[in-house]
Amino acid sequence: MDTGEEPPLEGLNVFDASQGVAGPSCAFLLAQYGANVIKVEPPRGDWVRQAGKKYGDLAAGYVNFNRGKRALCINFKTKGGLAIGKRLVSQSDIVIESFRPGVMGRFGLDYETVKKTNPKVIYCSISGFGTKGPNRDKPVTDVVAQSFTGWMTLNKGNDGIPHKVGMTAMDVITGLYAYQAVATALYRRAVKGSGKLIEMNMMQAAAAFMGQKIIEHVKQEGKITVLGAPTGTFPTNDGSINLSAREPDKFHALCQLIEKPELEHDPRFNEWDKRIANVDELTAIISEATITKSNAYWTKELDKLDIINSPTATFDDFLYHPQTKAADYINWVNHESLGNIPMATIPGHSPFADGILAHAPHLGEHSEQILSEYGYSLKEIEDFLKTGSVVQYGET
């Protein structure tokens, strides 16, 4: 599907010096909406290239969060490499970095220095703990953010121990908030003509994302919040199903379906607040009924009653469901290194089949091309390659 619309961020130049997931995911969204994003990496590459199973110099995480970018590999520790970095940031609309506080300053690439030659730059600096406080210089990964902010207490296992959510949730959330902040700063610049420093950190993003739970924790003294009953996951004879029958009419319908009409009049369950107070007993009774039949049966019958429900799906269930295909949740792309892979459609964005928006670059894949675009001669580029200031993919 292609709407033929002009990408809204076309013409914007982005210097993406970030690594990992948070910064790259922000830059990834800018690229998907048409910005010219240059992925700037040191000779060793973004560390996420090595995270998980590797496909040459690529890994699934790198591919997912760096689609649509071009790659430039430069060594800031060389005179030539640093000069290249300074030239590019002076001509960039947006700069994104995710080093610990002070690192970019040591190279003269911090906001205060950059804005002297590029006053309209939007500079997004992403860190773990922020630029203040006793933890400002501590290294952070997603699991640290999940642990420090209390997020893991929302995911206790049967052992009662808080566990990490099995993906880089805090990183992705930080990237989304960073993209939001950059987008509003772009509008501000269009209206007022001024640049902006955006200081983003993972703990702040996590707190914002969990805002409701944090308020509930304080007001309810740590007690678990039950929004209504019956809701949640119930066992079936071939898996489990999730349903919500909180409203009185839905509870009535569910009681009839599981052939337990007496529950409606049971003094433990005949009012909203009573169902919440006795949620464990109610859940156990409903589970005794749901475990006798299959997911397919319950889905069909609950749908008839317009009761919110969904079987607990695997990734394969989701990927190959007819709804997933019909609504373009996923694009299947033939990647040159990974083969046929599923790529999630950006919400609100037109699906794509292949091309630059689906391509995640190899380390230094576009180095020579980018340097040429920024005014460097062939002789200068050759010298950069010889001195190790620049690395071009495919050249030794």
Predicted regions and their residues:
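Aromatic-enriched alpha-helical interface/lid elements that frame and gate functional surfaces
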Residues: 87, 230-305, 309
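N-terminal helix-loop segment corresponding to the beta1-alpha1 unit
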Residues: 1-191, 217-218, 362, 368-396
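C-terminal active-site "lid" helix and adjoining low-complexity regulatory extension at the edge
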Residues: 341-379
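Substrate-binding/catalytic subdomain of NAD(P)-dependent oxidoreductase enzymes
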Residues: 185-218
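Glycine-rich beta-alpha junction loops
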Residues: 44, 128-130, 202-207, 238-240, ...
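Short linear loop/turn motifs
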Residues: 265-277, 313-320, 380-396
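A glycine-rich dinucleotide-binding beta-alpha-beta segment and adjacent secondary-structure elements
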Residues: 304-357
